[in-house]
């Protein structure tokens, strides 16, 4: 590994650790020329997921877009940010295990809603109202009735 300080091509590994749930290897190195220490990260190069939108267009999967939608749905709700980040990570992992490359946007929305329903029902209804594009109160009430039936 080339030294980031002097550019020398040889370094020795002082320490190796697993990070990010085993998806990253962190190595502490020392340059054989200038003796300065630096850190490198080694991670799997994942194939990017492509989302097929309802209208047929394609766009790159963006976990920040999912998190943003969840944050709006969970506004003023007692849900920690790390819980939402964990939810997005779980959904992304499940998508990667079920799809090679192209994912229907419908599947992403359904996965998020199924998990959000178990975390916070108010946030779930907010998310569902946007995702399912409720156009009238009747459709909204149907969703609420479905939630109430699950509780009994």
Swiss-Prot record:
All copies of domain ATP-cone, residue ranges: 49-139
Disulfide bonds: none
Co-factor requirement: Zn(2+)
PROSITE patterns, sorted: ATP_CONE (PS51161)
unnamed zinc finger segments: 3-34
Cofactor detail note: Binds 1 zinc ion.
Superkingdom of the source species: Bacteria
One GO MF term: DNA binding
Presence of keyword Repressor: yes
Keywords: ATP-binding, DNA-binding, Metal-binding, Nucleotide-binding, Repressor, Transcription, Transcription regulation, Zinc, Zinc-finger
Pfam families: ATP-cone (PF03477), Zn_ribbon_NrdR (PF22811)
InterPro entries assigned: ATP-cone_dom (IPR005144), NrdR-like_N (IPR055173), RNR_NrdR-like (IPR003796)
One GO-annotated biological process of the protein: negative regulation of DNA-templated transcription
UniProt xrefs under PANTHER family: TRANSCRIPTIONAL REPRESSOR NRDR
Protein family according to the UniProt entry: Belongs to the NrdR family.
Free-text function comment from the UniProt entry: Negatively regulates transcription of bacterial ribonucleotide reductase nrd genes and operons by binding to NrdR-boxes.
Protein name: Transcriptional repressor NrdR
Organism of provenance: Heliobacterium modesticaldum (strain ATCC 51547 / Ice1)
